[in-house]
């Protein structure tokens, strides 16, 4: 799992350090336990970070004490964010949750747009339905990470379609497999087009690894 963690951290670090400039105001949605705080620190940005899981927020806030001059961590998501306008909003491994239903998708994208200045960026890493659905309906990589999906998800591309995910390591999956909504990039691009232009949609890791890393895509949208 160390190799997997390094791959994922490297991909996140590259995006963060490439797309965020010193002095930028950034919102990190789905910050988890604050494992990326040092990556944000390297950019010199002012960071707001949030997560819907209160246990994760508590740990992130403890980690963030040393960064208190430039970092604010709160419980929630973009829908209960303040009136601050950001240079960028990031969703690393968390955007799939706005695909819970049509209302959540639409309201989340609208709120993201309202909190980004014109020309600002909406970016991150997301499990990509186009990379998941070609896999066997129950697929396990050599590290024991497992994904399950049904054929219904292939033929009915819509919000609310779910997969079952179990990572063999990591506190989020400590109690077992978790259902997660599927992110369909065509739906996302279409719904976001009212406010954003797509700049990039590529594999998180360019080479095929045979690991769960292969299901993730990097995305960058620019606010119009």
Predicted segments with their positions:
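A short acidic, Gly/Pro-enriched loop at the edge of an enzyme's catalytic core
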Residues: 81-89
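SAM-dependent methyltransferase
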Residues: 123-190
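Conserved alpha-helix/loop element of class I SAM-dependent methyltransferases that forms part
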Residues: 5-22, 39
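A short glycine-rich, Lys/Arg-flanked "PGG" loop and its adjoining helix->strand segment in the class I
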Residues: 104-118
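Class I SAM-dependent methyltransferase SAM/SAH-binding core
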Residues: 34-78
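Residues lining the SAM
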Residues: 92-95
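Conserved class I S-adenosyl-L-methionine
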Residues: 23-32
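C-terminal lobe and adjacent flexible extensions of AdoMet/dcAdoMet transferase-like proteins
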Residues: 166-224
């Amino acid at each position: 799992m160390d190799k997997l963690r390094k791959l994922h951290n490297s991909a996140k670090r590259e995006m963060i350090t490439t797309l965020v400039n010193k002095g930028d105001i950034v919102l990190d949605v789905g910050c988890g336990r604050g494992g990326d705080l040092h990556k944000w620190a390297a950019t010199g940005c002012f960071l707001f970070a949030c997560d819907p899981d209160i246990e994760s927020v508590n740990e992130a806030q403890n980690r963030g004490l040393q960064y208190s001059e430039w970092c604010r961590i709160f419980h929630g998501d973009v829908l209960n964010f303040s009136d601050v306008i950001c240079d960028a909003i990031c969703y690393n491994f968390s955007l799939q949750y706005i695909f819970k239903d049509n209302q959540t998708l639409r309201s989340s994208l609208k709120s993201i747009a309202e909190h980004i200045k014109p020309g600002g960026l909406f970016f991150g890493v997301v499990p990509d339905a186009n990379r998941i659905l070609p896999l066997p309906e129950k697929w396990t990589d050599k590290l024991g990470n497992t994904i399950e999906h049904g054929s219904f998800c292939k033929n009915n591309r819509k919000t609310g379609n779910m997969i079952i995910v179990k990572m063999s390591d990591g506190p989020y999956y400590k109690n077992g497999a978790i259902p997660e909504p599927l992110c369909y990039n065509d739906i996302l691009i279409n719904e976001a087009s009212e406010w954003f232009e797509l700049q990039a949609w590529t594999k998180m890791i360019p080479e095929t690894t045979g690991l769960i890393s292969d299901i993730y895509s990097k995305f960058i949208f620019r606010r119009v």
